[in-house]
Regions:
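AMP-binding/adenylate-forming catalytic core of the ANL superfamily
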Residues: 92-102, 109-111, 282, 393, ...
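Gly/Ser/Thr-rich phosphate-binding loop
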Residues: 168-169, 276-284, 293-356, 369
Length: 549
C-alpha cells in the first residue's frame, strides 16, 4: 500500500484516459449513466463555466443539494480549478444556512428546489433578497459580503440566479488555456473540501480537508475491502457528509470502479438498484440498513451479488450487523472516525473475524498513529483500559476555518487530534468504541456508558432501535433514560424492559426512564443527536406527568 500525491482532478483524468468507456456514475432508477470520459468532459465544461462567473483558486463554492447528478460534477470542477467545495446539510433551516454561508465566506451557492418540507429557493431569497433585483453575477449583500452568485442546479430559471445550463454556455467563452493554467497550480495539499461538523454535540465548525486527506483515506478504505475496478458500490448515504464524499466517492475515484448513486435515501430504490446493477458493495448508517431489512418487498430482490460494505456513521448494533451478514450476504466492515480525520481513523478489514468486524472497529489506518489516552492525565492507556481516542497522520484536517481556538482545543502540540470519543485497544491492536466523553452518564458517582446498555437492550425481542442518554436527576445528578423504537406491530410496556434487565445488568444501569418513540433526533447525515435526547426526555416526562427525582 502507498499514499498518492494526486489531486481529485488528476485521479479523474487518469481513469478517463485508462478506461474511457467504463461506466463510472450510474443512477439506476432513471437509467442515467456516465463513463469516465463523459464525466471528465462535463467536469471540464463546468469548470470553465465556474471560471466565467468569477470562481478561481481559493474561492468557496457551496452545494446545497441531495445526491443529484451534477453534485459530483461540481465537486470535480471546483477541485480542478483550486476552488473549495463547501457542503451544506440538506436538513438545514434558515438560520443554519445563513450561519454557514457567513462563516464560510461563500462566493457561489449552488442549490436545488428543496428537500422534504424545505423550499431551498425561497430560503435563498429570504437570505439574499437582493437576488430579486440584481443582475446575475452582480450580487452585493451587506450581510454576505463575499457572495456573488447563486446557481440553480437544473434547467429551471429563477430571478437573479444562473442555472447549470447557462453556466455551461458561459464556459464556452473561457479558453482551455485558462482552465489548464488553474489546473497546473492545484497541489494535493490544498484544501478542496470544507465540511461542517454534523452538530451532534453543538454548533457546526468548518473542517478544512485537502486532496491528500480525502483521496488517500478513500483509497485505503477500499483496500480494506479488497476493492478493484470490477466493483460496483451502491451509495445511498448523503454526499454532503464524509461517509458519502470520501468513503464512497473517493474509494471509487481511486479504484476506478462504478458508483451507483441513490439521489435520496429510499430503501426500495436501494434494493432495486443493487438487484438491477448487481452491486458488489453497499454503505449505510444503521437506520438505513434497518429500513432495508424491514422493507415489505425485501425478499423480492436478489442480494447475492453483494460481497462487502460499510456500516458506520453512528454506533452500530452487533445484532443488526449479524442480520445484514445473514440476509444480505455481505461481509460488513466498520470504519470509525470523524470529519476531522477525513474521516477514517480505524477500520476493520474484510478478512477479519466476525467478532472484529462486528464488535470492534478494527485497527489503525495505514500511515497513521492511533493511541488511547487518559483524558485527565494525557498518559497513554495500557491495553484493555478505556480512554480517549487520538489520531495523528496524513488524514488529520488542516484545521477549523477561521477558528484557531477551536482547532487548538482538538489538535495538541504533537499534532495528535483528540476525538472526544472513548475507546479501548485490545491485545491484538483492535479498538472498540465505548461512547463519547460528553455522553457518559454519571449517576451518583457511578460512570455509566450508554453504548453498553444499548447493546444489551438490542437483544430484547421487539426492539428495532434504541438509544440511551442521561436524564437530569435531583437525587443522583443523572438517571438512565432509554428511548426505544419498536418493531412494527410489537407492543411493549416499561415493565417488560425492566424485567428483561433485572439480574442481567447492574441495578444502577437499569433505565429509570423508558420512552417508546417513533424516531430519534437526527442530523441530515443520519447521526443521532445525543445531546437532544436529554431535552426530549424532559419533554416526554412533562407530557406524561412523570416526576423527575
Amino acid at each position: 500500500m502507498q499514499l498518492f500525491d494526486r489531486t481529485l482532478g488528476q485521479w479523474l483524468e487518469h481513469w478517463a484516459e485508462e478506461t474511457p468507456d467504463k461506466e463510472y456514475i450510474v443512477y439506476s432508477d432513471r437509467n442515467l449513466r456516465f463513463t469516465w470520459s463523459q464525466l471528465n468532459r462535463r467536469v471540464d465544461d463546468m469548470a470553465k463555466g465556474l471560471i466565467a462567473i468569477g470562481v478561481e483558486r481559493g474561492t468557496h463554492v457551496g452545494i446545497w443539494a441531495a445526491n443529484v447528478p451534477d453534485w459530483l460534477t461540481l465537486l470535480y470542477a471546483c477541485a480542478k480549478i483550486g476552488a473549495v467545495y463547501v457542503t451544506v446539510n440538506t436538513n438545514y433551516k434558515q438560520s443554519e444556512l445563513e450561519y454557514l454561508c457567513q462563516n464560510s465566506d461563500m462566493h457561489t451557492l449552488c442549490i436545488v428546489n428543496g428537500e422534504k418540507d424545505s423550499d431551498f429557493v425561497q430560503m435563498t431569497y429570504t437570505m439574499l433578497p437582493e437576488l430579486k433585483t440584481c443582475e446575475r453575477g452582480h450580487l452585493k449583500s451587506e450581510r454576505f459580503p463575499y457572495m456573488r452568485n447563486v446557481v440553480y442546479v437544473g434547467q429551471e430559471k429563477h430571478r437573479g440566479m444562473y442555472n447549470t445550463a447557462e453556466i455551461l454556455l458561459l464556459g464556452d467563452n473561457v479558453e482551455d488555456d485558462r482552465l489548464n493554467e488553474l489546473k497546473s497550480k492545484v497541489d494535493c495539499h490544498d484544501v478542496v473540501n470544507m465540511q461542517y461538523t454534523s452538530g451532534t454535540t453543538g454548533f457546526p465548525k468548518g473542517v478544512m480537508l485537502t486532496h491528500y486527506n480525502i483521496t488517500n483515506n478513500g483509497f485505503l478504505t477500499g483496500e480494506h475491502m479488497k476493492f478493484t475496478a470490477d466493483d460496483k458500490l451502491c451509495c445511498c448515504v448523503p454526499l454532503f457528509h464524509c461517509f458519502g464524499v470520501v468513503l464512497a466517492t473517493m474509494n471509487c475515484l481511486t479504484h476506478g470502479c462504478t458508483q451507483v448513486m441513490v439521489e435520496r435515501f429510499d430503501p426500495l430504490v436501494v434494493l432495486a438498484s443493487i438487484h438491477k446493477e448487481r452491486c458488489t458493495a453497499l454503505y449505510g448508517v444503521p437506520t438505513m440498513f434497518i429500513a432495508e431489512l424491514h422493507h415489505p418487498m425485501f425478499d423480492l430482490f436478489d442480494m447475492s451479488c453483494l460481497r462487502t460494505g460499510i456500516m458506520a456513521g453512528s454506533l452500530c448494533p452487533v445484532e443488526l450487523m449479524k442480520q445484514v451478514e445473514e440476509k444480505m450476504y455481505m461481509k460488513v466492515t466498520s470504519v470509525y472516525g470523524l470529519t476531522e480525520t477525513a474521516p477514517g481513523m480505524t477500520a476493520s478489514r474484510i478478512d477479519d473475524p466476525f467478532d472484529v468486524r462486528c464488535n470492534k472497529v478494527g485497527h489503525d489506518f495505514e500511515f497513521t498513529e492511533v493511541k488511547v489516552i487518559d483524558p485527565e492525565t494525557g498518559e497513554e492507556c495500557p491495553v484493555g483500559v478505556q480512554g480517549e481516542m487520538c489520531n495523528r497522520g496524513y488524514n488529520t484536517m488542516k484545521g477549523y476555518y477561521k477558528n484557531p481556538e477551536a482547532t487548538a482545543e482538538v489538535l495538541d502540540e504533537n499534532n495528535f487530534l483528540h476525538s472526544g470519543d472513548l475507546g479501548i485497544k485490545d491485545e491484538d491492536g483492535n479498538y472498540r468504541i465505548t461512547g463519547r466523553i460528553k455522553d457518559m452518564i454519571i449517576r451518583g458517582g457511578e460512570n455509566i456508558y450508554p453504548r453498553e446498555i444499548e447493546e444489551f437492550l438490542y437483544k430484547l425481542d421487539g426492539v428495532k432501535d434504541v438509544q440511551v442518554a442521561g436524564i437530569p436527576s435531583k437525587k443522583y445528578g443523572e438517571a438512565v433514560g432509554a428511548f426505544i423504537i419498536l418493531q412494527e406491530g410489537v407492543q411493549m410496556q416499561e415493565a417488560d424492559v425492566r424485567d428483561f434487565c433485572r439480574n442481567k445488568i447492574s441495578r444502577y444501569k437499569i433505565p429509570k426512564y423508558i420512552f417508546f418513540v417513533n424516531e430519534f433526533p437526527m442530523t441530515g447525515s443520519g447521526k443521532i443527536q445525543k445531546f437532544r435526547l436529554k431535552d426530549l426526555g424532559l419533554q416526554l416526562c412533562k407530557e406524561q406527568g412523570i416526576e423527575i427525582i
